[in-house]
Amino acid sequence: MSTREIRIATRKSALALWQAEYVKARLEQAHTGLQVTLVPMVSRGDKLLDAPLAKIGGKGLFVKELETALLDNEADIAVHSMKDVPMDFPEGLGLYCICEREDPRDAFVSNTFDSLETLPAGSIVGTSSLRRQAQLLARRPDLQIRFLRGNVNTRLAKLDAGEYDAIILAAAGLIRLGFEDRITSTISVDDSLPAGGQGAVGIECRSADVEIHALLAPLHHVDTADRVIAERALNKRLNGGCQVPIACYAVLEGDQLWLRGLVGQPSGGTLLVADARAPRAAAEALGVQVAEDLLGQGAEAILKEVYGEAGHP
């Protein structure tokens, strides 16, 4: 393969294609004459839309097929939503670029109500995330949480059809797809802590492709990467994936990194929260530290219960 050509493995969803096109445009802007093509494919997570993610189980639901394409030399890089990327990579692959983060917050979307606070008791709220469910029910145990999967357009259509009083989505996805006007209100990270890596785009490639690594370097955003490294370290220590009730969010404060982590019962009955600060150079250690604090509060028992109900380890 010539280093003047890059093939991007991507899922076929509108949001995934937006992310891949974004990376394509950035690469072409940074490297005159570089040919960039997309290799769209369907992941297991895209096929299994009739069950909650926690019930499907397994990590890498949205990335495994893309990684296979890299290993089989059918593509040169794979573009992912960072919140979907497992903590560990197959031998020969690695994460070599994290792009600048979009708004990491969750968004409240409703055609009738202005905010989570104004929802009447008994309102039906759609989400596919145990993380969101745990935090929503902790604040509003009077709400009904109903399963919601599908791409952004599908979820909005279900809301518009009256199946839900409100739905909760990642603000970043709505903004990127041009649906910012559908965001009724953004939810503060104090009220709904995001998933680790939410709003960030990551690029995976073969570890041996040093020329590709060099081409990706201009797209790497160090401030975002340091935050996401801390968040992912917490997730890794808790053995978490995108389908468990773990939340974490890091903020840069000068040369210091602040990280908050949360583990919650899906019922909202118990929310465990921990936070700490450390020099940004110690991002990974900070993630482990906050995870250890959560484990000391009893996070392991909550996560074992969730995994047990889902029927997978």
UniProtKB/Swiss-Prot annotation:
Keyword entries, A-Z: Porphyrin biosynthesis, Transferase
EC code: 2.5.1.61
Listed cofactors: dipyrromethane
Reactions performed catalytically: 4 porphobilinogen + H2O = hydroxymethylbilane + 4 NH4(+)
Chain positions found as S-(dipyrrolylmethanemethyl)cysteine: C242
GO cellular component: cytoplasm
Function as written in the Swiss-Prot or TrEMBL entry: Tetrapolymerization of the monopyrrole PBG into the hydroxymethylbilane pre-uroporphyrinogen in several discrete steps.
Other facts: The porphobilinogen subunits are added to the dipyrromethane group.
PANTHER family: PORPHOBILINOGEN DEAMINASE (PTHR11557:SF0)
Assembly and oligomerization: Monomer.
Protein name, as recorded: Porphobilinogen deaminase
Organism whose genome encodes this protein: Pseudomonas putida (strain ATCC 700007 / DSM 6899 / JCM 31910 / BCRC 17059 / LMG 24140 / F1)
